[in-house]
Amino acid sequence: MDSVGGHLVPVFDGHNDALTREDHDGIAGGRPDGQLDIPKMRAGGIRGAIFAVFTASVGEREDPLPRDDGVLEFELAPEVAHPAAAASAAIAAGRLFALERDGHVRVARAIGDIDAARTGEGAPVAVLHVEGAEAIDPGLESLDLWYAAGLRSLGPVWSRSNAFGHGVPFIFPSSPATGPGLTEAGIALVRRCAELGILVDLSHLNEAGFWDVARLEAGPLVASHSGAHALCQASRNVTDRQLDEIGATGGLVGIVFAIPFLREDFKEEGDAPIALIASHARYVADRIGVEHVALGSDFDGAPVPPALGDASRMQLVLGALADVGFTAAEIEAVAWHNWRRVLAAWWTAA
C-alpha cells in the first residue's frame, strides 16, 4: 500500500543525515543513491523533517568488533576538536540555508512554520539539528549565534564523549548504562537550550546522561531516532524504564528505521520487513501511549528495510502501523501531531 485511505498522510520525520552525505548537492533535484531528497519527500508525503548536521570522526570503524564474551561492539569514535567540528557543522548547515534561499525548504524557526507545512502547499519544512555538540564551544558563547541562524534541535553527544557528556557506544547486547552522564558544561548546555527554545535530543546519550537531563526538567524527553530495547537489546535503544519517564514528561520516541536497531539479533543482513518498524511502534504505544510514538527514520544514516528503500515510500510505514492496529487518527498522530506537540512545548517554553 502506497498511501493510507487513498491519500498521502502528512508525515514529519524526526531525523535524517542527508546534509552530511557526499552527494548532498542533489537534495533539491534528486539523489539516485540517496535515501532522502526533496522529490522523495514529496512522493512519500513527508512535509517536514529534522535535518542533522554531524561531524564524523577520522578513522571510524564500519564493522563491530566481537569481544571474547560474544558481545558486538563498535570502537567508540574519538572526539572531534571544537574548531574542526564548528567548521564542519557550519558548512553542512549552510547547505540547508542554501536550500531555503532557493525555495526548496522552509527552515523552521517557530511552530507556525511547522503548521504551515502540513497542508502540502509550498516547500516542506526543515528543522536544523546539531547531532553531537562539539560544534558548540563549552562556554556556550556560540549557541546564541546558532539559535539566531535557525538551530532548533540539538543532541549534546553523538556516540562518543565530548565536553558535554558521554555518548552511548554501539554495543549488542547491552543496556545503555555505559558510563557517566552529563558534565557541568552539559548541564549548562541543556539549561540554556531550554531558555532559548532548542529541543534536546537524547538518542545518542547514555543512560546516566538521560537521567541527568530528566532531573533538569527542561522539557519533554525526546529520543528522536531510537527503538525499544525490549525488542532489540542494543545499547542505543530505549529501556522500559526510560520509556516510562519519556511518557511521564509528555515526550516521545521517534521510531528509528535502522535495521540493526529493529532486529532482535542486531544484524543488518537477513529478513528485515517494514513490519519491524511497526512492531517497535506498537510496543512503545502499548507501554506508554500512542501520543508518545513518532517517526525518526535516520534516512541516509543507516540501512533501512529493503521494501521501504527510501523516503518516497514512507506511506508504507503508515500502512504497517495500520496492520498492527493503529487507527487512522492514531496514525495521523504518530505521523505528525505528536512531533508538533513536543516541538511546540520546547519552542514556546522559551
Go through each PLM region and give its residues.
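Divalent metal-binding pocket/active-site signature
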Residues: 134-137, 146-236
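N-terminal hydrophobic targeting/anchoring segments and the immediately downstream early-domain regions
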Residues: 1-176, 233-295, 299-350
